[in-house]
Swiss-Prot record:
Membrane topology of this protein: Multi-pass membrane protein
Transmembrane region(s): 51-71, 76-96, 98-118, 126-146, 156-176, 187-207, 233-253, 264-284
InterPro entries xrefs: Cyt_b558/566_suB
Intracellular or extracellular location(s): Cell membrane
Name listed for the protein in its UniProt record: Cytochrome b558/566 subunit B
Source domain of life: Archaea
Length: 310
């Protein structure tokens, strides 16, 4: 137990590995999957696909270990960790994705996941209320997964609007976190703005070039798993990605590593989790990602509600 205690006290190395593996599995596995089917010449395509698979497994086992280390703070994380372990063996069941086991398991994950996110908010500061739109976005993804896979009925809503509202809350939370006027905070804001600039130029290029607009509509929504019911909303998606990159970089530079990495995990998996390619990790990851966003908070809302609660 002392080993786990030491690991919990020094979570940063795991967050670094988790951040790197989640980024590269997204780039080489999720994001690479769709451009690779287009009539484009991709050099060393086989190597890139292999790298994607390697980083996917590194990501899986790192997020599994991270969830184990979060159990001390979030008691419901025990059930999410157990669900991750069970998901390893689910494919051993013939036609598991069409079995009552699969449907029951998805409903179970949804109920526990929403409860865990509520626990995460209650065990963090008052500023975490700004993350409620992000919690709502993850909850919608979980409910959308049940609606599609269990009841075979797609949940129609403006996912891009949910994403943008989530971003508004997350950026506000990032700016308010550690309000000390330090050089590090100013550097974080400056670098975040610099990261946003290329996306602004991309928005202009895509908006003024119909061919690029069509190409981006073929790639970006499929990469993220998000449904754009209006193809002209592709520029809004580019804006959302730019603001996401800005907020994540700001969080990491300001020292809130878990929030930056957690939000990246949320946005890169929350919409994929609706269908998830029948891979449960894409349904579970946003839940763990949200818990990571609030992990560094010391003051707790639950202590304000009930001061005796420890």
């Amino acid at each position: 137990m002392s080993v786990f205690r030491d690991l919990r006290e020094n979570l940063r190395p795991f967050l670094i590995v988790l951040g790197i593996s989640s980024f590269f599995q997204f780039v080489f596995k999720e994001a690479f999957m769709y451009p690779s089917i287009l009539p484009l010449n991709v050099p060393n395509e086989g190597i890139l696909e292999t790298l994607g698979n390697v980083f996917f497994y590194v990501y899986f086992f790192t997020i599994l270990l991270t969830s184990l280390l979060l159990i001390e703070k979030y008691k419901l994380m025990t059930l999410i960790t157990a669900s991750l372990i069970i998901s390893l063996f689910a494919p051993l069941i013939p036609n598991y994705n069409m079995s009552p086991f699969w449907y029951s398991f998805e409903i179970f994950i949804t109920i526990v996941g929403i409860s865990l996110m509520i626990e995460s908010v209650l065990k963090s500061s008052i500023y975490s209320l700004l993350l409620l739109p992000t919690m709502f976005m993850v909850a919608v993804g979980l409910i959308g997964s049940i609606s599609l896979n269990v009841f075979h009925h797609a949940l129609f809503m403006s996912y891009i609007m949910a994403y943008l509202i989530s971003l508004l809350g997350y950026l506000s939370y990032t700016l308010l976190w550690d309000k000390k006027k330090s050089i590090r905070s100013y550097i974080g804001i400056a670098v975040g703005v610099l990261v946003l600039i290329p996306f602004i130029f991309s928005i202009y290029e895509v908006g003024s070039n119909r061919y690029l607009e069509i190409l981006m509509n073929m790639i970006l929504p499929s990469t993220l798993g998000i449904d754009l019911y209006n193809p002209y909303h592709i520029t809004l998606l580019l804006l959302a990605l730019g603001l996401s990159a800005m907020g994540i970089v700001m969080s990491i530079i300001k020292g809130n590593y878990s929030a930056g990495i957690g939000y990246f995990i949320v946005i890169s998996t929350v919409f994929l989790g609706i269908d998830g390619y029948q891979v449960l990790i894409y349904m579970i990851s946003p839940i763990i990602g949200f818990s990571l966003i609030t992990y560094n908070e010391k003051k707790r809302i639950i202590d304000i509600i009930s001061p005796r609660t420890k």
